[in-house]
Amino acid sequence: PIYVSFSCLVLAIGAVYYMHSDVSWGMYLGLALLIYGAYMWFRDVVIEAEHQGHHTPVVQIHHRYGMTLFIASEVMFFVAWFWAYFDVSLFPNDFVGNVWPPKDIVTFDPWDIPLINTLVLLLSGTTVTWSHHSLLEGDRKGFIQGLVLTVILGAFFTALQAYEYHHATFAFSDHIYGSVFYMATGFHGFHVIVGTIFLAVCLWRGKLGHFTK
C-alpha cells in the first residue's frame, strides 16, 4: 500500500508538470510504478487465496466492506461531474452565452454512437451477470462464455468511444461543455478499460480453475 500510494503521488505530480510544461516523463514514470505495484499486489492476493488459504471468512468480509466503500467513493466521484453538468446546463450563465449547449458547440447525435455504446454497456451487464450466475450454479462453460462475451463488448465499447473522440468537433478547452464532456466520459471510459482488463484476468484465472461457487 505504501509503494502504491507513493506511485500515485509521483503520477499526480508528473501529470501536473505535464499540463504546465509538457514534461511527461514524471507522469509516465508514476504510471509505470503504479501498474507494477498493482500487479504485484494483485498477484499476492491470488497467491494468498489459491495457494496459502489465507482468505478466511473474516478476510472475505473485509474484502466485501472494502469493495462497498470503493463503490461508494466511485458514486460520489461521478456525482461531482453530473453536478457540474446539470449546474451549468440547467442554469447557463454569461460565460456560455446564456444558452446550453454553447452556440458554437456542435454536439453528438444522441441516437448515433452514444445510443450504440449505451446498448453495448447494457448488453455487457447482461453477459457478466450470466457469467456470475453460471459460476454460482457450477456451470463453468457458461461462466467462461459469459466472460468472453463481456470482454469483447468492453473492448468494442472502448473502440467506439475512441472513434467518437476522434471525430469530435470540439476540444477539451472549448468552453465548460468540452471540459465536462471529456472529463465525465473520459473517466467513464477509463473505468471500462480497467474493468475489461480485470475481467480478462478473471477469464484467464477461470480457465485455470481458480474460481468456485
Protein language model regions, located:
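...captures the hydrophobic TM-helix bundle architecture rather than a specific catalytic motif
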Residues: 1-213
